[in-house]
Every structure is written in C-alpha cells, then in structure tokens.
C-alpha cells in the first residue's frame, strides 16, 4: 500500500510582485508543495496567470485580495513579497497563527530596531519579532534557517557582497576595515513600479 505524502501548504503574500513569479516557478517544480493561497493588495477578480501570462495552463489560480483581519490560518509557510513597512503589518499575523514566514522585504533584516530605523528612516512597528528573524543566507546560516519560524531574506546587494567576502574574511585574507563595494542595479531592481 502506497502512503500519501503530506504536502506543505504554501501561501504567497504580494503574489503579483516579480519575486513572487520566481517563487511560484520554483514551488511548481517541488513535489511536496501545494500552493494554497495567493494574496494581493490589488482589487478585483483575477488569476495569477492574468498578471503573469507565462503561468497560463500551469497555475490559473485566483488571487485573493488580502484583508489583514481575514488571512488564511491553515498554511504551513508563507512567502511575504510586500514592500518594506507594509510587510511588517502582515508578518506577525502569520507568526501568531503558527505559520512559518520567509519575508522578502527589508523589514526583518536587522535585529536592532534602532539600526532598522536609522537605515530605513521609518519606525518599525513589529520590533518584538526582529531578534527572532534568521538572516536567510543558507551558505552561512543553513542550520539556523532550518529551525527558524521567521527568515529574513537578504537583499541583492548584501548577498553579492557577503557571498564573495565571507570566505575571504573567515580565512584571514581580507581585513574588514578596508573593504569597498561598488555595486549597480538595473531599472527592474526596485520592483514593478519605476522609482
């Protein structure tokens, strides 16, 4: 008798973001995952394939307009692909429901509220979860990520710098007081809307 595999129920919050499309593509290839919820701030009835035509006939699932007081509580994990400040409104709702969260915004990348507020020039409204977040760089924090309820996905600039520098620093080849990083980004580096 074959045993049925239990699928991990996944939600994507901010489903119309470009990063969400990439998450969907990865998850669709995973045999143990079921995409159960696609939440968006957009109004109206539409499917994810209406926003991303490449998903037509692959994932024609409807998107749900997110209401903070009426979010699904039956998920195993949620990917939050919302802009900074907005993400921190949703993350604690899922954590309080016992749902693991991978936050793709910058809202949980710093463990100190004062550091976040200095660099992002805005108040952090969920400081109690800052020190619970694990920096989501598996090359360095793989074991912590496995156990984390909240993973703060690192940004592109820090990732490019850390991946190259970490082995050099840990082996004593580079001193941290004289590092200069010069990085550039294309127009799509800041999301769907031009900035």
Question: Residues of each region from the PLM?
Answer:
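Short, Lys/Arg-enriched N-terminal segments with co-localized hydrophobic residues
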Residues: 1-7
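N-terminal Rossmann-like NAD(P) cofactor-binding subdomain of oxidoreductases
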Residues: 7-195
């Amino acid at each position: 008798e074959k045993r049925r595999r239990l699928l991990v129920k996944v939600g994507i919050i901010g489903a119309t973001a470009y990063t969400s499309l990439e998450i969907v593509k990865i998850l669709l290839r995973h045999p143990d995952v079921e995409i159960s919820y696609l939440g968006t701030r957009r109004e109206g009835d539409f499917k994810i394939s209406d926003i991303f035509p490449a998903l037509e006939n692959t994932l024609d699932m409807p998107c749900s307009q997110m209401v903070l007081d009426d979010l699904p509580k039956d998920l195993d994990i949620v990917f939050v692909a919302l802009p900074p400040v907005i993400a921190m409104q949703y993350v604690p709702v899922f954590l309080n429901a016992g749902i693991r969260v991978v936050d793709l915004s910058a809202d949980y990348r710093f463990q100190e509220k004062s550091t976040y507020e200095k660099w992002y020039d805005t108040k952090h409204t969920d400081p109690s979860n800052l020190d619970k977040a694990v920096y989501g760089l598996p090359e360095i924090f793989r074991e912590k990520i496995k156990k984390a309820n909240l993973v703060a996905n690192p940004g592109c600039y820090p990732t490019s710098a850390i991946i190259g520098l970490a082995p050099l620093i840990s082996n004593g080849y580079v001193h941290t007081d004289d590092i200069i990083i010069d990085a550039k980004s294309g127009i799509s580096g800041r999301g769907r809307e031009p900035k």
